């Protein structure tokens, strides 16, 4: 059921330690994947964030993996659409998802995370979101809608997904791994027993999914 999303090929080579540029690829005219990079145990990984373009502004789902790219992404989106980022939703507490929400809080951009994610962030001495996600609520921003849902533990105890009913697209975050994934990535906070059960619940809830990111 999971359809792999084709990302823009990386062009050229980069010196050791240099941050790879943000890669953006469309799902449709309003929904996009953006890809950032980091390494874990000497292996390079990508992180797929998403953003939704509405007539009131851009909703960001997860932050760039590198904090140095937060402002870069904001500027890219403003230049491309002439619209500001109007909200940031974090799908769990890790650096490639919630990162450092203080950047957005300081810009008075509304930030959202679940109570569990915020408790994890607070425990780690990191900035928490300004608003708490209401799971199952249909969020409306301009002409677009989406729902943030929790089906159980997997990659982390707080991993949530985002459902875009108009497009039948699911942002699975780190809960969903691509068919080409060679491993589960970081499992230090994972519940590998419950993980497949959680995914099964998700699929049962959304049998009409057209695309998973």
Q: How should each PLM-predicted stretch be described?
A:
Residues 35-44, 121-123, 180-189:
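Acidic/histidine-rich helix-loop elements
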Residues 4-13:
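Sec-dependent N-terminal signal peptides
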Residues 46, 67-69, 93-99, 119-121, ...:
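Active-site environment of divalent metal-dependent phosphoester hydrolases
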Residues 30, 52, 62, 77, ...:
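Divalent metal-coordination and catalytic microenvironments
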